[in-house]
Amino acid sequence: MTDGPGPRGLDPRTPVLVGVGTASDDAEACELMVAATEAALADAGGRGLAGAVDRVAVPQGSWAYPDPARLVADRIGAPGATSYFVEVGIPQQSLVNDALAAILSGASEVAVVVGGESKRWARDRERSGRSAVETAQPGVVPDVVRARSEPPIEPVEVAHRLWDPVQQYAMIDNAVRAADGRTVGEHRAELSDLWARFSQVSVGNPEAAFGRAVEATWLATPSPDNRPLAFPYNKWHSTQWTVNQAAAVVLCSVGVAGRLGIPSDRWVFPRVGLESSQSVSVLRRARIASWPAMEVLGETAAAWLGRPLVDVEVAELYSCFPAAVRVQQRALGLDPAGTPTVTGGMAFAGGPFNNFVLQSLAAVVRVLRAHPDRLGLVTTVSGLLTKPGLGVWSARPDGRPPLLADLAYEAASVTDTIEAVATLEGYDGGGTVATYTVTYDGMEPARVVAVCDTDDGRRCVSLSDDRALAAAACTEEFIGTRVAIGSGSFAPA
C-alpha cells in the first residue's frame, strides 16, 4: 500500500520506532520473546499492527531453536512474516540497521527485532530435578540466515581455552591501565568506582535482575561472594547472564504509523545507525588499549549530528566488563568520569547473552519519550571489542533519513595489526609482555596468561604456572616485563 505524505510533513518512508517491550517471566526463551513482542505491539497501539508485521529478526542465543522468529511471528498473528536468524558475532545494531534500511527502501512495512534468554529458568529446573525442555521445531529452517564472516579470536587462543571473555577483557583492561600510567591499586579502584556508580543506577531500574547499590571497595576486594575470575576482575565486575530477560522493538515507516493510527507520542526516530563488520582478534591488535573502529563510528556519528557525542544526554554503553565501557568512553570522546547507563549495566541489570542491546534500546526509548528534547546513544559490542555498533535516537525528527552504514573499510584503514604466532609452541626466544591476566585456583592466583611482543616482531600467547609470579602480577605492573619464551611458557628474563 502506498502512503501519502507522512505526519509532521515527513517523507512517509521515514523509519520510526513505535513500540518497545520487555519480559522477565519464569519461562523458556521463546515464551519470553513472544511476551516481549506482544508488549511492544501493545506499547505502540494502533490498529492491526501485529497483522502488518512482515519481518521478524532474532539474534542467536544460547538456546537451540532453529527458527525462533517463526515461533514469534506465528504467535502474534503474522504467519506470513519473513523470519531472520542472525548468528552470534554480528552486532545487534546490525539487525536494527537492516530493518531500518528495509523500511526506508519500501521492502518492509513493519519489522520486529526481538531476542531473549532464560538461563535462570533452565538452571532452576536443573537444580530442582526438573527438565528444562525447549519448544521443538522439527524440520523448520529460517527464511534468511545471516552468518558471521569469521571468528573474533585466533585458533591458538581457542586451542588453549583463551576464548573466555573475562580473560580477554581483563587483558584489555590491564593494557588500559598501562597506557594510562596507573598503578595496579589505582586501576582496580578506578574500575570498581565506575561499577559502583553503575550499581547505584540499577537501584532505580525496576527490571534489573540484581539491582542493588554496592561499594567500590567491596567490588575491588575478592571474597567468597565476589570471587576472583581473571585479574583485575572479580565476579561482580562481570556480566551476569543467568537471567530470564527478553526485549523487542517494533519499527515501521511514519506513513504506516499514521495509517495504523499509532500515536505520535510513541514515535522515536533513528538519527544514526552505524556498525563495523571488520574483525581483528585481541592478539593481533597493535593497540590493545584502544578501539580505532569505534573511534571511526563515533567521529562519523558526531559529524552527522553536528555535535560531539559527549553532548548526547542519554547513553547506554555496552557494559559486559569495565574495559568495554572504559575503552568506549575514550573512543567516543565521552566523559571518563561519567556513568553512561540508564539500566545499571550488565552486571546489575542483567546481561542476557547476545541480547543486551535490545534491552538497552527499550530502556533508552522510554527515557526519550519522557524527555523528547534529548538524544539517546546505545552502543553495541560484538565479540571482544571486535565489531562495534552504535545508534542515536530522538523523539524528534530532524527531517533527514537516518545515517545507516557499515564502516568496515574505514575501520580497517585505522586499525594497525600484528602477525600472530599460530601455535602456543610456535616461538622460542625473547619478548616483552604487551598485556596479561591472572587466573585463579579458588581464591589463589595460579596462572599468568600473557600476550607478548616477540623479538622478531610478532605476537604470541604464553603461559606461566609459577604461583609466586601470578601473585606478584596481581600487585605489581607486569606489562613491559622482558621474558624468555619457549614451549608455550615464559619466565622473566
Which residues does each predicted region cover?
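Conserved "HGTGT" condensation-loop signature of ketosynthase/thiolase-family condensing enzymes
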Residues: 1-85, 101-108, 112-256, 262-349, ...
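Oxidoreductase and adenylate-handling cofactor-binding alpha/beta cores
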Residues: 363-370
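Conserved phosphate-binding catalytic cores of ATP/NTP-utilizing and phosphoryl-transfer enzymes
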Residues: 93-101
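Internal, well-ordered alpha-helical segments in soluble enzyme and binding-protein domains
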Residues: 95, 168-172, 357-360
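Active-site capping/gating regions of soluble enzymes
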Residues: 376-378
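A conserved active-site cap/scaffold subdomain adjacent to cofactor or substrate pockets
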Residues: 349-357, 373
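Soluble or luminal CAZymes and related metallo-dependent hydrolases
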Residues: 32, 91, 356, 360
